[in-house]
Amino acid sequence: MKFKSILPFAFLVLGVNACTDEDEGVGASVQPVGDLLSAFSNRIDVSSSSVFVDSVLYKADFLYLGQYTDTYLGTTQCEFLSQFDARIGGISVPDTSLFSYTNKLGISKDWLTKIDPDYGNIKAVTNPNKVQVDSAFFLIRFDDEVLGDTNALQAINVYALTANLPTFAKHYTNVNPDDYCDKGRLLGSLAYQTANRKMKKYASNGDNEIPRILEVPISLDFAKEVVNAYKKNSSIKNQRQFNEKFPGIYVAHSFNEGAIVKINTCFLRIYYHFQGKIHTTYKGKDTIVDSKSLGRANPLVKSLSIACDKSVERVNVFKHPNNSSLKTLAQSSEFTYATSPASLYTQVVVDFNSIRDSIVRKVGPDSSKLSVNSALLKLKAASINWDTKLKKTPNQYMMLINRDSIADFFYWNKTPDGLYSFNAGLDTSDFSFSFDLSRAVQKRLKGAKNSEKLLENLVVIPVYITSSGERRYYHQQLWPTASRFYKSSADEVKLRPCIDLVYTRRE
């Protein structure tokens, strides 16, 4: 076999530059004109600072509750407001459905056999009447991710809202609860220690999930009003009408500080019983039992549960009562900080003129044949070195984003586009975050439309990522965290924030 052609080839030689502009592209004497691809690199220093932020958009899978004081971050207090997911049309009171197992949430089919083995299973319940509320609780389930002193005694109050949260609105964490609640109707209170909350199995499908739970006793008068909304003759026919009658609840931190918890679910549960005709068998023959005749053994006991979930309007309220500690951190001459929730951002100033000038000095003003291969903004992180219950290493993911676009980014579930938003994970090999700015730098060098807005007003914020199938979702971090980065004043050059720029020019 003969090869009748010779494949041409080209050499790509990278000229590596640290902080100077003296290096030139190499390889011109090797390749013919028109085939040459010269490479260059620059290091561009950037400046950074900490800026205080008093609120962020609330759009999260979780709610947060409690109060914790850190030596340097000061006090963080978490409360929340929420509507109820009424499920109008999906719930009726009294509920006569039957369950095949003994459960305080339903009517057990085999209840009568426990009274008299000659009875058979309950087949149906008819003529339900005389509903009576027995008790009501606002239940708050949280996982093991707790921050603070779990043995400290703290308390919460649950109030009825007097005004509705705006529908389909952007809710921010500095919302004033007084705009929606005059605190004139206290529904319930609870003093608790996080460590002592009993563990309860609540999964009936064998998964054995065991969350911690807070049970706040709720006013029976309020519970009766809610139950009436689900009766057959109720005038409430949809969620909007329900919200007009019951705008929601405000869960407020009452006293003392201890721990902050991450809430998985929370809901109002009302227990009630009623009377009715129980259709069953006795010694194999059909019979009807009047529940009144059973007295305290009446099996017609049910519950009504309505959740404060993501399908309704809700918002966390974050307060930093003594933010002087945060402001002191923001003035640090050694580090910048990105903390959560709603406290400090690291602001990064990218001087695009410095980027352009460094390129012009090497290749001239013509950028038509220029390609930006890499423009990595590197931030070197440092562990927290003070006594704290916070995680001392940086948040796993950071986002560099135009500050004015933060709310829209998270509200519309956007993903980093490499123009106005950039994501980076912690590189544990050198404890740094690297944000790829190459696309934005390229567009601005080429003078693309509106490119003058790129790389402006940038801040670094902590985020976390979830996924569903192949889709990734980015969420602003609302759990208390603290990350810090070296400033340009760091003694070691390698610790200073900078952009490592690599670009090529076709001759």
Predicted region positions:
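Secreted, disulfide-rich extracellular signaling modules
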Residues: 2-9, 13-507
